[in-house]
């Protein structure tokens, strides 16, 4: 009887370990996917600042955003796209974008929250470059079999006071 109990306990432990490892692999695949989507958006913007459709292909129609440029929440992919199109016509452009300290939290396999520090570089029409720093959060939801960006919050990350 003791041997049977020992086998059952060992079996349960092995199953729990296997399930946990499988969940961790799925979470890592999700993390890799949402980070890659974010970097692809940046690459599309760098390649062509007017390619708003390409930049927002993974954005949900009900997308919302907070950022330091506007005092209110921006509601909807359509509104965000119109503002991005106007920004794409500006004389300056993004020439570099990097993600530092990324962290992805996955919930129930269909919600992913990506937080990171953004380090970028813009260039104006005269060739002058300006570094850009931000603290960022993006929320993704799996709709069907596709991850979609549903919310983002972008905040400035000022240099520390000396």
Where are these regions (language model features)?
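Short, low-complexity N-terminal intrinsically disordered segments enriched in polar/charged residues
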Residues: 4, 19-58, 149, 160-162
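Solvent-exposed loop/turn segments at secondary-structure junctions
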Residues: 70-72, 120-122, 154-158
């Amino acid at each position: 009887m003791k041997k049977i109990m020992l086998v059952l306990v060992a079996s349960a432990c092995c199953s729990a370990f296997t399930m946990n490892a499988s969940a961790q692999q799925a979470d890592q695949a999700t993390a890799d996917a949402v980070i890659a989507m974010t970097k692809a958006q940046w690459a599309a913007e760098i390649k062509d600042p007017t390619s708003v459709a390409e930049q927002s292909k993974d954005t949900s129609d009900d997308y919302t955003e907070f950022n330091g440029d506007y005092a209110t929440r921006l509601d909807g992919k359509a509104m965000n796209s119109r503002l991005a199109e106007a920004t794409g016509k500006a004389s300056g452009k993004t020439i570099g974008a990097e993600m530092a300290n990324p962290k992805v939290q996955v919930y129930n396999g269909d919600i992913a929250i990506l937080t990171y520090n953004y380090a970028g570089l813009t260039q104006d029409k005269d060739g002058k470059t300006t570094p850009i720093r931000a603290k960022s959060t993006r929320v993704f939801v799996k709709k069907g079999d596709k991850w979609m960006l549903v919310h983002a919050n972008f905040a400035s990350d000022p240099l520390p006071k000396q």
